[in-house]
Amino acid sequence: MPLVVKGKVNINEFIDLSKSEKLLPSMFTPVKSVMVSKVDKIMVHENESLSEVNLLKGVKLIEGGYVWLVGLVVSGEWNLPDNCRGGVSVCMVDKRMERADEATLGSYYTAAAKKRFQFKVVPNYGITTEDAEKNIWQVLVNIKNVKMSAGYCPLSLEFVSVCIVYKNNIKLGLREKVTSVNDGGPMELSEEVVDEFMENVPMSVRLAKFRTKSSKRGPKNNNNLGKGRSGGRPKPKSVDEVEEEFDNLIEDEAETSVADSDSY
């Protein structure tokens, strides 16, 4: 049984259509159609992975048109016994963007002791149909301190999106309900147990490191990480140093005290 049921995705949590937009035919409203995608699923087998995810699965696109990714719901389930240690960070990525901090759309962190979790991300931007057909979205997964033998699947993730498909790039006439988005950067929804770690290593830094490590051509646009700055500011810790601190953090038994209720 899927973790996310299509009928349970509430469009009103992301957008608020006027009465006329709900009643009039599509030809009389700026909105061509509001759609909910089919479920796309990823089985996570590696501690660190960057995988493509189809956020528009089952969505009928318009040739020469646009699609607006209003929001998405991500559900996860740990395939582990109860009270296991460790945790995971999940980050949504737009692979077109070369700067890691601009590529990260939203991220979420949780402990393995919380068997099921669900969160929403509000990207709230549009792309062309041509770009959409290239499957531009990815998910970066980083599992920490989950001791499972290689070849098995500790975590399952499922994705459902709410989007608007339209022909002309005109004002949509929607009042978006956007929550928890900071002007200074992408949205990050955090579990208390890893707040201290994530303040030092945002997911954009992890993405930059993963891209550099995976690329045969070497680093491209992230070669300024870790350089000192003038003005007496302290030199930031390296990613490896903070990751070691995180390993020690999630070893702590207090990790199992994460709230067991699903929340956005």
UniProtKB/Swiss-Prot annotation:
Record GO biological process: transport of virus in host, cell to cell
Pfam families, A to Z: MP
Positions of the UniProt region annotated as Disordered: 211-264
Keywords (A to Z) from UniProt: Host cell junction, Host cytoplasm, Host cytoskeleton, RNA-binding, Transport, Viral movement protein
Molecular function in Gene Ontology: RNA binding
Organism listed in the record: Tomato mosaic virus (strain LIIa)
High-level lineage: Viruses, Riboviria, Orthornavirae, Kitrinoviricota, Alsuviricetes
One cellular component term from this protein's GO annotations in UniProt: host cell plasmodesma
Gene designation: MP
Annotated family: Belongs to the tobamovirus movement protein family.
UniProt keyword Nucleotide-binding present: no
Oligomer status and interactors: Binds to host RBCS at the plasmodesmata; this interaction seems required for viral systemic movement. In resistant plants, interacts with host MBP2C at host microtubules; this interaction prevents virus cell to cell movement. In resistant plants, interacts with host resistance (R) protein (e.g. tomato ToMV resistance protein TM-2(2), AC Q71BG9) at the host plasma membrane; this interaction triggers host defense responses leading to programmed cell death.
Protein name according to UniProt: Movement protein
Subcellular location: Host cytoplasm, Host cytoskeleton; Host cell junction, Host plasmodesma
Keyword RNA-binding: yes
Compositionally biased spans, kind Acidic residues: 241-255
Function field: Transports viral genome to neighboring plant cells directly through plasmosdesmata, without any budding. The movement protein allows efficient cell to cell propagation, by bypassing the host cell wall barrier. Forms a ribonucleoprotein complex with viral RNA. Binds microtubules and modulates microtubule stability. Can bind double-stranded DNA. Triggers host hypersensitive defense reaction in incompatible plants harboring resistance (R) proteins.
